[in-house]
Amino acid sequence: MAQNSMPVQASGYKSIWDTPLAKGVKFAGTIIDRNWEESFISRIANTSILQDLTKCAQMIQFKRPPQAGPWRPYELNQTLITDQPTQDSFCITICGSAYKSLKIDKEDIRRACDDWPEFEQGFLDDSWRQFENLLHYSLLGRMQLSVGSRNLGARAGRDGNINLGTLTSALHLSPDNILNFFTRMKMVLQQAGRWYEGEMFMVVPEEMSVLLLETMFAKQLCCNMSESLLFKGLVATNILGFTIIESQRLRPTIDRQTNRLVYPILAGWNEAYAFTADIVDADLVEMERSFGVLYKMLGVYGGGVIYPEALTKAYVTFSTAGLVPNP
């Protein structure tokens, strides 16, 4: 009986892998991936207090400290007025969810041979990076919406006399006033009673680094600032007590009156906002009606503000940034 053999294509080759086109090809590894932003979540939010919440719609309750009320002046023989201590609470719910579903044909796995483990690890790593990218946008967006009403705008601060800029009237930062800007942000948090040395952060757009470098060199030329505590090396990582975190996720808007990009800048205490996220389910399933396998992953994320008065936000433009052309 004739031996079984693979079907031969009209070209005379059993598969494209046997053609001269495929001969001599050597695998040289994978090119360098794009420059993904390093995760900063744990540096700007409390990621441990909600750690036990791993399912969508789970809720955790926080109690605010009890209030006893102010002391009253005493007069001889007066009838005492009593106060009753009060306490309220608030809840944070984990309500965000997202999934990733990837189909891989078994034939692709066989053809990949020894390269399959690297390929598999590559798309699993990228799936996590894409999830983390979603978390960055969600966290920064929600934190900006959670800033206390006295800690933003043109009338910020305890007395309403600190200007942090608005979308339509942003602060224009230059080497002449950049240090004053950091002082304003710090003062707002100090007046709110939420300044904790060594635990404060400031998330700035990457465009801020250009202004900081220009400021550093300008002051060195005029004032010999080489030993300044504000700038060490070419990157400022701590300014006036703020740990500086650069992020691409602070999206600007355009002020059409000036044609400048207006950026939000977020600062505060790293315990002010609670946030958690996790991939809670991951399965590898063989698909029906096809020779394929399905990678399924489900992630949940969410959080909420605990101390809104411990966050502050400003709107700024940069003298080192160019103008946006008219539409």
Each predicted region: which residue ranges?
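Short, flexible loop/turn elements at secondary-structure junctions
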Residues: 66, 204-208, 299
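Assembly/oligomerization interface modules of large self-assembling protein complexes
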Residues: 32-99
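Short helix/loop capping segments that flank catalytic or ligand/cofactor-binding pockets
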Residues: 70-73, 112, 211-214, 304-306
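Alpha-helical scaffold segments that mediate packing/assembly in large oligomeric complexes
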Residues: 106-190, 313-327
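Sequence/fold signature of self-assembling virion shell proteins
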Residues: 2-45, 53, 159-180, 214-327
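Structured, hydrophobic secondary-structure cores that serve as assembly/anchoring elements
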Residues: 89, 94-118, 142, 175-219
